[in-house]
C-alpha cells in the first residue's frame, strides 16, 4: 500500500483506447464507493464509453504506471460535453448519481452528449457545459500526490482553448475529495435554492453520501480567480480557421513534435503528398493572418528542408500555447457573435 504524499510514483497519461475500456470499467466496478452507486448499470458503462470514444464531446485519459514489460492502468478520467437540458435535469430534485444516469441514457439511445456539430456550434457561441463522468483510480494510487497532480495536469491540457460555460466535477467519493474539489475552485450546488453556494446545504458527510453536485460557471469563475479551475475559463478566439483535417495534422505533429511527413502520413492514414499539401494550406492560412509567424512560407512548400523544419517548429510552438486553434469551431458563428458583442 502506498502512502499518500511522500513517495514519487512514476505515472503517465494517454487517451483511452477501445482496448482499455474493460480495464477501466473494472476499476469503477471494484471501487468501494463508486461501484455500488452503479449497481446493475455497471453493465452499461463499457458499452456507453465504447460508443462515445472518438467523439469531439469526450475528453478522457487513462493513467498508467510504466513497468519494464508493460504499463498498468491505475486510474481513469472521462468527461463529456452535454446539452443544457441535461444540466437542468440533474440539478432538479431528486438529484441522480450522474455516472449511472449517463450510462443508461447513452446505451438507451437518449444520449445527452453533444454531437460533433453541436460541440462546434457551442464552442463558437454560447459555450460548452461539461460533466466529469469519472475521475478515480485504484485505491493504492488515487490518494498519492503524483496521481492527483497528473489528473489535474491532464485535465487542464485537455480543456485549454475551449469556450467553457459550466463545469461540473465527478461526484465525490469522500469528504476529503469533496473538499479538494471546492479548494480547486468548485462551489456546492444547492438544489433548493437552485444556485451554487460557498457552503454545503447540509453537513459535508451527509452531502457526499447522497447524489450531489459541485461545479462552477464562467460568471462565477470571475469571483474565484485564485483557483486553477478558474483559469480554464480564460478564452481567446482562434485566429487562423484551420479545417478539421488541418487541426488533426497539427495535433498529431504536436504529439510527436519531430514527426516527419512520412510518419504523420502513416499516423493519419494519408498519402505523403496529401500531408505536404495540407502543410502548404496551413502556412497560407497563418501567413494571411500573421505573416511574421511563418515568414517566406513558399520556401516550406518548395522543399527548402532546414527552413521548412524551422518554420514548422515555430508554428507548433505557437499552437502549443494557443490550443484554441485546435478546437472545433465555426468561423462564421464566431464572427457573428463578435459583431453582437461589439454592437456592430
Where are these regions (language model features)?
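Short helix-to-turn junction characteristic of helix-turn-helix DNA-binding domains
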Residues: 252-258, 319
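A short helix-loop-beta-strand connector motif used in the catalytic cores of GNAT acetyltransferases and
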Residues: 47-75, 82-89
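A short, polar/charged loop-to-alpha-helix boundary motif
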Residues: 83-100, 253
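Short alpha-helical "packing" element that flanks the helix-turn-helix/winged-helix DNA-binding module
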Residues: 246-252, 264
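Recognition helix of helix-turn-helix DNA-binding domains
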Residues: 259-307
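Linker/hinge segments immediately adjacent to helix-turn-helix/homeobox DNA-binding domains
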Residues: 111, 148-245, 273, 293-294, ...
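Short amphipathic alpha-helix that is part of the acyltransferase structural core
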Residues: 2-44
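Acyl-donor binding region in acyl/amide transferases
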Residues: 92-185
